[in-house]
């Protein structure tokens, strides 16, 4: 069977090669921002162009391009789309039962102010879900809840994408950092510690920035005490846990500390002027619902948390290992014509080394986040006393609403894997290593590009981690800093990742309106990654002693 060795400068001039490699991304941007095409149309055009470039410019065999496309599409369906289907199904069950109205009233008993509700739900609760499950589920769940609480769909989706910036690096129990650390041979605690130091300021900024987007400086002034409590408690807990515990728990710990601290503070303080994004007058009549009904109303999300906690336990994961009790539920399909037949080339590997891509589609029927959410939905169905016929109707409605978002997600992941396996995405990253001492400024941009293309900080770190490390060594820079830059830069690209955009739009009923959401977030993402470039450069050249040394 033929082998394919990636080439990163197919035209013999790195900048010409970059220009060609950029074409699919530019087409995607133009499709959404200028031509206002639907997400699945933009994704299809981009993946089609990337496939043509992969074959004609990068000399990738057509069969390998086809397999890369199919693998990406399948990965988009399972586990990504399955997570979103399950999350929306859970939310819709709550609405169908009528208990969501009781939940809404209980939330509004904490505060009626939409600015603070976005912090509690989008930032605090969303960060907890990101720390536990990741994969877009937190955005879908929190955005849907905020719409139910009266915020507009576009607002809810956009603000939740921005709120999701702070916890992404430590998402899914720290996998983005631990996976990269293992791949590059650097202790995970060092990258975790440096990430916590840099994200301290990001985590402080994000809640205030969310309020600013909603209500300007007036909003910050009116809500400052509560937002400060949320931001500082989150940033402080994230800093301490990332520096002393490692990458696994900061996302969960910081979110819980912030959520509890803010909710307790709001028992004693409320903003004088209540802000409602829908322009309606703030009014709240204390409900006469029995406390048991309130507990039942919250039960879907309490059950979700409990199931997630179970799903991430080592003893539970061991059940799916070889010869484990539930190992039968794991299915593997290897793409024989590309698995271990696509090879990385220097400088992504050392000159005397060889690295290939194992391409195995893993269909984990039970051991996947989507199934944990779906199980929570089934248990919630019993607690909420939703009839089976109604639940089936809700599930069918969810699938119908998700048909175009599912197509979009599949095409986006196909685009990602065609770009990754052909070497197109690596060309973009490699060009930035030619910037010499300015590399520190562009280092976060590499992670940003990686997450834009793949939708995953983990994938970006695995894709570009070795490049960041080798470039740092050649430029005599602290490699922990550039590895951290890749991780943090990736978190800033999450809000414009086509995958994230598609998920958020699906959750709030804006399927086909991806261009509106993309325009809302792209400018902030670009500003943030530019600021991060300045921060990384300042650390590298002014205060390098704050970077943990590899012993």
Set out the residue ranges of the language-model regions:
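Hydrophobic mid-bilayer segments of alpha-helices in multi-pass membrane transport proteins
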Residues: 20-29, 37-59, 81-87, 227, ...
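Juxtamembrane helix-boundary/capping and inter-helix hinge elements in multi-pass membrane proteins
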Residues: 95-100, 112-113, 146-155, 182-189, ...
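Juxtamembrane and boundary regions of transmembrane helices in multi-pass small-molecule transporters
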Residues: 2, 169-279, 488-551
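Re-entrant/interfacial helical elements at transmembrane boundaries that shape
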Residues: 137-145, 161, 174-185, 430, ...
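Membrane-embedded alpha-helical segments and adjacent helix-loop junctions characteristic
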Residues: 66-152, 385-471
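Structural signature of hydrophobic alpha-helical transmembrane segments
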Residues: 9-23, 76-80, 133-138, 189-204, ...
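Transmembrane helical segments that form the transport core of multi-pass membrane transport proteins
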Residues: 281, 288-446
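Alpha-helical transmembrane segments of multi-pass membrane proteins
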Residues: 115-127, 153-166, 187-207, 410-411, ...
């Amino acid at each position: 069977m033929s082998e394919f060795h990636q080439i990163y400068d197919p035209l013999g001039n790195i900048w010409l090669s970059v220009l060609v490699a950029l074409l699919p991304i530019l087409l995607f941007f133009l499709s959404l921002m200028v031509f206002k095409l639907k997400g699945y149309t933009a994704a299809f055009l981009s993946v089609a162009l990337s496939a043509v470039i992969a074959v004609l410019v990068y000399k990738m065999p057509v069969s390998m391009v086809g397999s890369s496309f199919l693998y990406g599409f399948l990965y988009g369906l399972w586990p990504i789309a399955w997570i979103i289907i399950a999350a929306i199904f859970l939310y819709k069950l709550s609405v169908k039962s009528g208990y969501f109205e009781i939940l809404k009233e209980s939330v509004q008993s904490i505060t009626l102010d939409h600015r603070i509700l976005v912090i509690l739900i989008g930032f605090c609760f969303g960060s907890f879900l990101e720390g536990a499950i990741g994969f877009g589920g937190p955005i879908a769940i929190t955005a849907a809840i905020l719409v139910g609480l009266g915020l507009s769909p576009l607002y809810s989706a956009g603000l939740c994408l921005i709120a999701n910036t702070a916890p992404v690096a430590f998402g899914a129990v720290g996998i983005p950092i631990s996976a990269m650390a293992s791949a590059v041979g650097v202790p995970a605690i060092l990258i975790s510690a440096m990430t916590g130091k840099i994200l301290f300021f990001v985590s402080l900024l994000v809640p205030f920035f969310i309020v600013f987007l909603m209500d300007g400086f007036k909003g910050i002034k009116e809500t400052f005490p509560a937002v400060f409590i949320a931001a500082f408690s989150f940033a402080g807990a994230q800093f301490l846990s990332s520096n002393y515990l490692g990458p696994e728990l900061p996302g969960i710990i910081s979110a819980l500390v912030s959520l509890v601290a803010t909710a307790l503070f709001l028992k004693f303080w409320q903003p004088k002027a209540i802000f409602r994004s829908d322009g309606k007058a703030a009014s709240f009549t204390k409900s006469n619902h029995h406390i048991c009904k309130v507990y039942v109303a919250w039960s879907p999300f309490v059950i979700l948390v409990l199931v997630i906690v179970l799903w991430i336990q080592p003893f539970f994961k061991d059940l799916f290992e070889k010869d484990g009790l539930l190992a039968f539920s794991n299915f593997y399909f290897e793409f024989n014509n590309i698995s271990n037949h696509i090879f990385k080339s220097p400088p992504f590997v050392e000159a005397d080394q060889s690295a290939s891509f194992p391409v195995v589609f893993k269909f984990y029927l039970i051991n996947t986040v989507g199934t944990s959410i779906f199980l929570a939905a089934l248990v919630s169905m019993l607690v909420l006393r939703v009839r089976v016929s109604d639940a089936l109707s809700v599930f069918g409605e969810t699938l119908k609403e998700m048909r175009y978002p599912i197509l979009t997600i599949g095409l986006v992941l196909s685009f990602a894997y065609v770009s990754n396996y052909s070497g197109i995405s690596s060309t973009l990253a490699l060009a930035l290593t030619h910037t010499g001492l300015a590399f520190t400024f562009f280092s976060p941009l590499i992670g940003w590009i990686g997450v834009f293309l793949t939708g995953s900080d983990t994938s970006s770190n695995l894709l570009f981690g070795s490049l960041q490390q080798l470039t740092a060594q050649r430029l005599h820079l602290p490699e922990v800093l550039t590895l951290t830059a890749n991780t943090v830069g990736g978190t800033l690209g999450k809000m414009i990742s086509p995958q994230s955009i598609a998920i958020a739009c699906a959750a709030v009923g804006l399927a086909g309106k991806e261009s509106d959401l993309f325009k809302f977030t792209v400018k902030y993402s670009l500003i943030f990654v530019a600021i991060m470039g300045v921060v990384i450069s300042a650390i590298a050249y002014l205060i390098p002693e704050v970077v943990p040394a590899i012993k």
